[in-house]
Every structure is written in C-alpha cells, then in structure tokens.
Amino acid sequence: MRRTLCFGIALMLMLMTVCYPVSAKGGSMAAAEAARFFAALDILPAEDTAETETVTRADAAEAVVRIMHADAATQETDGYFRDVLTDDPHAAAIYTAARLGVFGKGAETFEPDAALTCAQAVKLAVCMIGYQKKAEAMGGYPSGYIKAAREADILDGIPTDTETAISYGTWLHLLSKTVHADLLDVAAFGSDYVHFKITPGRTILTEYHHINSYEGVVIADSTMAAEGDVLKEDAVLLDNGEKLVNENPDYVGLVGRYVTAYYKEVGGKNVLLYVRGENNNIITLHAENGSYSYEQNAYYVHSGRGETALKLDLYADILYNGEATDGIDASVMLPKNGKVTLIDRNEDQRFDTVLIEEYQNAVIDSFDRFSGRIVLKKSPSMTETERFLTPDTDTVIIKNGRRIAKDDLKADNVLMVYRTKSGRIWLSVSSKSVSGILSGMDEDGCRIDESSFAVAQNAYVTKEELRIGEYYRYLLNAENEIVDAVAESQQKTGYILAFSKPSGFGKVRARVLTGSGSIVEYPLSDKVTLQDKDGKSRLSASEMASRMENEKRLVS
C-alpha cells in the first residue's frame, strides 16, 4: 500500500542529540571541553577545578609528564632542586619534566608552589612540541618562545605576560592546542647551522599516545540496517570507510554529523575515544512522488508556498545506501522508497554531503535452511526484489550490523532490502508485529487501538482492503512501518462507558474501559452484535446505541 501524504514533503531539521560542543575543527577547545577531552583520552584526570584558579608550577609538571606520556613513577629523583625533597608527592613529576628538558635545571630552586606565569606556560608548550632549539635561536626566553609559539600556531587567544599567573582555563586551552600541533624535529645540524623538519600529522597525540583522529561524516551506526559493510555491535562508520567501536553510551545520534573522531587501536580494533560534532545544517527529504525533483545539482522542493531550491556543492559527497558513489543519475537521487538527507557542513548554504537511503519491503513466506533460498510472499511490487534475492556469492545478509542467523529468517518476518550501485545487497530483518483493532485511518497511517503507525509506501495491502473496527495482526519493518496486515478473530472484553451515534452515515462508536485501565473509543461494525443486560437478545450496534445511550454494560 502506498502511503498518501497530505503535508507534501517533510523537511526536518534534525536536532543535535549528542552532548558535546559544536566546533569540530582544529585543536582549539574551550576549557570545559578541553577538560572532557583530556579525561576521555585518559591523558589528564578529570578535576573539579575552577577555570579562574591559578596553576602552580608543580601542577604544570604533573600535566607535562602525563601529556608526554613519561612514566614519572619510575624516574629517579636526584634532588638537585633544594626546595623539592625526594619524598615530595610532586617530586617524581618535577624531576621527570626537568629531565625531559621542559623545565630547566639551572636554578637551585624550583618553587613548586609558585604560580605558573603565562610566559612560562608558553615556554613549556613550545618545549613539548620540539621548538626549544628554534626558540633559543630566535631570542630565547621570553621573546623567542613567543615567536616559536606563534609559528607553531598555538598562541591564538593565549596571553604572554611574564608576570601574570595563567588561569586553569587558559592552561587547558593552551594544552589542547599543544597536543594537536605538528612536532618539530632536528633534521640536520653542524657547528654553525641547524635544519628543522615538520612531519604533518605527527603530534603529541599520535607520537606519545598512539591516538589518531579523522574529520568527516558519520554515515552509519549499529542501529541502521543497510551499510557499505558489516558493522560490529556498537560501532560507527565514517565516510572514509573507517569502522570505530563505540563503547560510550553518550555518543548517540552521530549519523549525518560532520565530526572529529579520536580513536586508538585496542586489541586489534579501533576504539572511539572522543567525538567533537559540528552543528551542521541538515534537511531530510522523505520520498514521495511529485513532492520534490532533482536537476542541475539541486533539489527543488514543491509545496503550497511555491518552489524552494536546495543547492548542492559542485563536489558534494554522495553516498547511496552507505556506499560512496560517482556518476549518479536523477533516478537514484529521487528514491521511490526511502529518504534523502542533505548536510551543509560549513554553513555556506550549499549542501556538501548527500546520504541516499532506498529500500524495498518484503515479507518472508518461507526459508529453506539447506539451500538458503528465501521465498517471499507474492506482491506486484516485489518481482524485482525476488529476482535479486536469489542466493549468489555477492549477497550479504545483515541485521543491525550483525550477520543474520538462519533462525531469524522465519515466515511473516519483514525484510528491508537495500541494494548498492556496485550490486551488493543488504537486508535487515524485523520480527516485530502488533495486534489490535483498526480504530481509524488518516493520511499518515493507521490508528491501532491507542497507537498510530505509518504505512510503508510499498506495503502488501492497501487502505481500501482494511476495515475499521476489524482486528488485525500488523507486520512492521525496522522503521516501525506497517508492511502487511493479517485479519484475525479476537474477542475483546471491556466495560462500555458510553455510545455515540453520529448524524448521517458515520459508524456507531463505543467508549470502552479496558482491562488495562485505559479508555479506548472503538468504531463498531454494522454487523457487530452485543448482548443486552440479561444476555438474551442480540442487537445491532445502531439498535444498542439507541437503547443504551447512557447506560453501562459489561460486554464480551
């Protein structure tokens, strides 16, 4: 049955459901996000410290050692700072930071409880990314280090005063820039020269923590049925084909987002550690013939208010059923069943990513466990589906990111069948069903008892075949849409509160208190019969309404 939508095309601006900041570019982070970032990556511990609080030199040494992934606990504390005793709780970190060359060893005292100044913080950052020799060559402390920090692009928004104490919030902001900066190495040197080199992408994160990052679009997660490859449970798929295990329950609603994903290999799997999601402009177009058209790199949405053009970027990324695709024609850009999601990643009013999801619904009649052949219920719209469901070496069957077990393929289960441009096929299977009386129908779907369900565009039945007041078992696909309805006889028991008899030719309706305690209004078929209070006479709905308009009766 094809669903008739009276509201034209549905344009849905998807709300951001993830709980992290909106900026996804670069390494600059506000203090609150930087704290979450370092804690998620297990680099710095989560601390309840006010952003305005000052940072001591001992605190800075602890942070430096953790960021440079040095094992401070095993380092020898040789005691050359007179004010840092070997039994001091910060001694290991202080002497390790000095050994790494981030703090100098020239002074007899370290002053662990003194506030770290802004200029000192900049010097520490410069030393951590390998710019110390270059900074000394450019004038030394503080001017040479300030120049080096500016060259490394970590100074924006950071004060450089030699007397002012750096706040905890500014310190975290500086550290977030530092761990994202490319490291500087000495390529060659002689008595009168030093040559430096930068390897793009080689940072503190990659070098010391083996943490990688990728900026791109999340095109799938494990809740989706059809992807470009089989997903493991609790995983996300990026548009570069990278699959990341997602063990954080807070990272939901990522599909369609342009994100920076930080991940690390653990036990042979890339595990998602942290996500920064950008607040993209996202519009979803639901398939309905005549609602919108596509031509000349733009979608044209037609409604009662006229025509609206949604322009695509000339080099927009197009993914059809989870697979990157080139040379797509207009027929694919306008799926008969499914939806098109448009994503404007940089808010320039042109959509950079197009996610096309197209599927067909099928209902299993039987499944042969030995041959692997799936026999479908007959439907005029399923002939092509039957053809490409014939088992072959290119067919992959998945369910919510996992391979389907043969026990999942049973009669009356619903398949959502997806096909990619390369010819591969993916299926999701749904064994969901709901039973109840059809209490009403409208443009959006059917009301079953107290709940409403949309009807799939290529369902097996039409609305004209359904009768209000009848009891059905409805087969649902993975999107909770009705695909088929099977009539069943069912005895309902309840307490009639009132009848209503509309004028004209409308159906008599009964307000019934059900056994669950809810009140449901049921339309009554003209053929229905009800017993009177003595259980003797059988009356039609119209006769009963006239006779018992304000009475209450127990009926079954």
Predicted regions and their residues:
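Short, flexible, surface-exposed loop segments at domain boundaries
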Residues: 169, 173, 180-392, 396-556
